[in-house]
């Protein structure tokens, strides 16, 4: 009888211990061709429709215009944010046509802190956009067309993210390189690819190239992908949007 009572006490105590629940999040990366579709129409609502279909928590956008002549002074990230109900964070990489051309993050909640870091780019300057959301850090980038510049981006990326060594880190974007390249081999010494390395994302109609990626920093209890989706065929951009479900 006494044994039974102690057993019940122990079981009750165990039931009262809170369990650590894994966090789940959907991420998307999307090169939006400055907001202009393959039909040469500026239609941010079409891009927003692609985003809303997946309902990601955070979206990394590349080739994002702000106040340029070719889009008649519009702020592309802001227009898409308005259609999706998300918060826009912008990083201009270069001055262009009276405005800026760069990258952006859309998020369901505003980041707690934002950092903009220049990256190597000889044909045009490149940028790393870092958003701290508390439990995790999400970054957006659009890497150089030149392999040497891409290689030289890795030390900068590692140095910047060292600040967040106690947080889970995700980097998304158009890396302008293939999964089996020398650059990706070097990058994967420090980062794990969460997206597919065999499913192409460019061009939009009949994809043949894998150049858009979602990666995470290697380490103990690193995040893992639980699902992925690539939407093919939309004229909203020349790239396909890539979504990855992650657990961390």
Regions found by a protein language model. Name each.
Residues 34-36, 115-118, 141-147:
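Surface-exposed cleft-lining segments at the edges of enzyme active sites
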Residues 116-117, 147-151, 159-170, 176-248:
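Metal-dependent phosphoester-hydrolase catalytic domains
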Residues 25-32, 47-71, 138-141, 157-183, ...:
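Active-site beta-strand/loop signature of hydrolases that rely on acidic residues for catalysis
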Residues 2-6, 18-83, 95-99, 233, ...:
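N-terminal, active-site-proximal structural segment of metallo-dependent hydrolase catalytic domains
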Residues 24, 39-40, 64-136, 221, ...:
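Structured beta-strand-rich core segments of catalytic domains in phosphoester-bond hydrolases
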Residues 41-45, 73-74, 124-125, 151-154, ...:
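Structural motif corresponding to alpha-helix initiation and N-cap regions
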Residues 8-16:
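Bacterial N-terminal signal peptides
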